[in-house]
């Protein structure tokens, strides 16, 4: 991240481009046919203290992934569902991942729940393939958790909570 890794002569944008291009070089080294996905947190959570990527970083990462046929998977378990002023943190870079994982904001502390959201293309591949997505956890598909998540999303969107988060975030 920029605090420790940015050279004195670089702007934050230049730093972001330099480290994003490290992905391009690694994909070239390995061969794009050997790289399935790039996984990252748009806002690094527990290991760094809620630090977002520098502007432009994820836009370049998206371009690199698209150019090489590599999926972009974003982990928004901690930062997603309104916690950054947009429904998803990645929206602030005007990109969309192929797969995004969300959790904590989805239940808003009322009920533990998580979700994996994917593009229509990935969904169709699963549906038209085996039609089965293998996963399993004790509380998977719990109706109370799903109802709580629906209620959280309703309030978040209907009560303009995202606008309030953006305003308060700018103030803080």
Predicted features along the sequence, with ranges:
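Conserved N-terminal phosphate-binding loop of PLP-dependent enzymes in the Aspartate aminotransferase
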Residues: 1-172
């Amino acid at each position: 991240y920029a605090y420790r890794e940015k050279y004195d002569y670089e702007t934050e944008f230049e730093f972001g481009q330099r480290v994003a291009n490290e992905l391009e070089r690694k994909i070239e080294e390995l061969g794009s046919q050997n790289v399935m996905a790039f996984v990252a947190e748009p806002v690094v959570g527990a290991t760094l203290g809620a630090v977002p990527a520098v502007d432009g970083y994820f836009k370049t990462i998206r371009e690199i992934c698209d150019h090489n046929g590599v999926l972009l998977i974003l982990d928004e378990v901690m930062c997603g569902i309104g916690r950054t002023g947009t429904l998803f943190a990645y929206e602030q870079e005007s990109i969309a991942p192929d797969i995004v994982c969300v959790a904590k904001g989805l239940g808003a502390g009322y009920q533990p729940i998580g979700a994996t959201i994917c593009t229509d293309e990935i969904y169709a591949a699963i549906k038209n393939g085996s039609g089965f997505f293998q996963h399993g956890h004790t509380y998977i598909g719990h109706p109370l958790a799903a109802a709580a998540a629906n209620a959280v999303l309703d309030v978040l969107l209907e009560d303009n909570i995202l606008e309030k988060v953006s305003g308060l975030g700018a103030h803080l």
